[in-house]
Curated annotation (Swiss-Prot):
It comes from the Bacteria. May function as a protein modifier covalently attached to lysine residues of substrate proteins. This may serve to target the modified proteins for degradation by proteasomes. It holds the Pfam family UBact. Residues 30-66 have a biased composition (Basic and acidic residues). One of its GO terms (molecular function) is protein tag activity. InterPro entries: UBact. There is a cross-link at E66 (Isoglutamyl lysine isopeptide (Glu-Lys) (interchain with K-? in acceptor proteins)). Belongs to the ubiquitin-like protein UBact family. This is Prokaryotic ubiquitin-like protein UBact. Keywords: Isopeptide bond, Ubl conjugation pathway. Residues 1-66 are annotated as: Disordered.
Length: 66
């Protein structure tokens, strides 16, 4: 049985940046962004909750002190 081994050159590592900077979304110019949403109005939230589940809305009012 005749075996041949091919010698591979040793792997060289190039200079490494000690602090690689991750690209920020503003640098890339594209990509998804977090939507600008404020907290929902509490009265509006309670009205919507009452439509869906009145008992849950009542428990939420008691829990939050509304």
């Amino acid at each position: 049985m005749n075996m041949r081994y091919t010698l591979m050159p040793e792997r060289r590592e190039g200079p490494v940046d000690p602090m690689p900077q991750s690209p920020s979304p503003s640098d890339e110019g594209g990509g998804p962004r977090r939507p600008e949403t404020g907290s929902p109005d509490k009265d509006n939230l309670l009205k919507r909750m009452r439509k869906v589940d009145p008992k849950q809305a009542e428990r939420y009012r008691q829990r939050t002190g509304e």
